[in-house]
């Protein structure tokens, strides 16, 4: 990322350079509200799979072009039954978070947008613009400010929490044409628990242990669940873990006392709390 050492004025400032902040900045490139500056103390972000339902809408054109894999068939499984569906209109797609965000970052900086590796600490309205104080001691001046920081969970929130392994196998064990959205053939004692399977090929897939509960577990818990699922349900005896991802999404949260600009992203209701999906809604907000 790029640091700015001098105080500068920007038509737009965005607090946070994650998915929501970068998506909005990219959408502003050809508008009068660009160039913009994004403020974020985090230099690197862990890899995640951004998955979404693609109905062919134009606002998903970029995401569609960057999709790692798409599926037109999906299923939900329990011990008692399997429900499979397919559609030519709705396609399930997944995008690598690093590929998506790196693409946006490149386009933003090529067009004179900037990233400041600093935390926004306060906001003041002046007679002519907005002044953002930062942890780098450099103030940022902008005409408009957007705040993409995630919301603060309440004390009694429910989380959708998960840990996933991307694995490779030496034998064909996955149907690469079929996404398993929820497989409930796993223990249910610790919460609403299912496995989520994105098969990238017959020998490569993301296997994610996902739970809805008020307690986030230690990594070993999910890893044990994935191991048992692979061995007992998938009937896979050996594999290599080539990537991991982990997260905890609060499904209810409180209003922050002082937003640093107009909220976007999760703080602006981009996530569907019943499912945890947010990617396509974040893009729709930006447009």
Residue positions per predicted region:
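A conserved beta-strand/loop capping segment in the N-terminal third of enzymes
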Residues: 55-118, 123-125
